Amino acid sequence: MAKTVLVTGAGGYIGRHVVRALLARGLDVSVVDLRLDEVFLRARRVDVDLFNAGEDIYDQLGRPDAVIHLAWRDGFVHNSPAHIDDLPKHYHLIENLLKGGLKQIAVMGSMHEVGYWEGAIDADTPCKPASLYGISKNSLRQITALLASQYGAQMQWIRAYYIVG
């Protein structure tokens, strides 16, 4: 049986490419997004409001082996108050997934967590975000690491730089 992966934000620019790559590897893929304009014929669409689904969200999503959490609002509006407003929603989603039994979660971060930095950047570069977006993403990274440790899950943080296409 193929590994099951759920992708949040599957209809976004990055999400579409992630879903295609996972399907090409023969994985069983489920997708969630507010807007799924593009049809993923081999992916299972899950119609769930991620941020209002309750504590049993993991069951509602079909208990996938892994979740790739890409969903985010106003990513290109760096000082939108939506970043701070939505942070608790992301926290509760991730907590409820892990509490429900999820053992592997990957979350999309951003170069904006690091802030302004000259020189090479690696996993040990200190984060000094300079926008509400960067502050929120950095906070979610720290929260997710704490929750993954608490629930014995594997956490992977994906930090993207200069997405073009």
Outline where the language-model segments fall.
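Conserved Rossmann-fold NAD(P)-dependent oxidoreductase catalytic core, especially the SDR/UDP-sugar
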Residues: 92-132
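N-terminal Rossmann NAD(P)H-binding glycine-rich loop of SDR-like oxidoreductase domains
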Residues: 5-25
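SDR active-site strand-loop-helix element
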Residues: 8, 32, 67-70, 105-111, ...
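Active-site Tyr-X1-5-Lys
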Residues: 130-156
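Flexible, glycine-rich beta-alpha linker
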Residues: 114, 131, 156-165
